[in-house]
């Protein structure tokens, strides 16, 4: 069986009780339905993957090149397109163009990896962005309490090294959280209850895939 994946929407967090009456914090993800719009094979494309489409959108908001992709697949335009890389070249045979994927594909899954876009924090200083300690609060410190300090030498090396941690835009990055437990799969409503937090804001797009490090199929 190929590694499974589906596009969905983060609906927010809540808490449920397990069989031992312990509180479990879960993230509610509306998973799918997705439709397969293209299958990439090792022979033709150099890698194995399936292209998934998700979300409603008015056809007049889709440009002509993208509309042509949907027309060739014989499906209505969707808001999002993403590729799911397959872990084995023969796994593409398990999919076909026009096939619909729902939350039911994770009925037997135990752990998943969730990818999303983290919340943007705006321009942030080094203490918030990188966890710097800051400088002295007193004993002669004047208006330098939250400054980063030295960023390099003067004559040598006479430059700032690439990758130096400094203030800047924080968040709005692609983030993957691995090995999250699937607490429940509600196939009737197309919802996944995933233990713990997943990246992104409420209403954000997420990709849920079977956990690669645990060998989930």
UniProtKB/Swiss-Prot annotation:
Asked if Ribonucleoprotein is a keyword of the record, the answer is: yes
A Gene Ontology biological process term: translation
What InterPro entries does this protein map onto?
Answer: Ribosomal_uL3, Ribosomal_uL3_bac/org-type, Ribosomal_uL3_CS, Transl_B-barrel_sf
Q: Which domain of life is it from?
A: Bacteria
Signal peptide range equals none
Q: An example Gene Ontology cellular component term from the record?
A: cytosolic large ribosomal subunit
MF annotations from Gene Ontology: rRNA binding; structural constituent of ribosome
Provide the alphabetized UniProt keywords. Ribonucleoprotein, Ribosomal protein, RNA-binding, rRNA-binding
Give the UniProt family note: Belongs to the universal ribosomal protein uL3 family.
Instruction: Explain the purpose of this protein.
Output: One of the primary rRNA binding proteins, it binds directly near the 3'-end of the 23S rRNA, where it nucleates assembly of the 50S subunit.
Quaternary form?
Part of the 50S ribosomal subunit. Forms a cluster with proteins L14 and L19.
* NCBIfam families cross-referenced by the UniProt entry: L3_bact
The name of this protein is Large ribosomal subunit protein uL3
Organism expressing this protein natively = Mycobacterium leprae (strain TN)
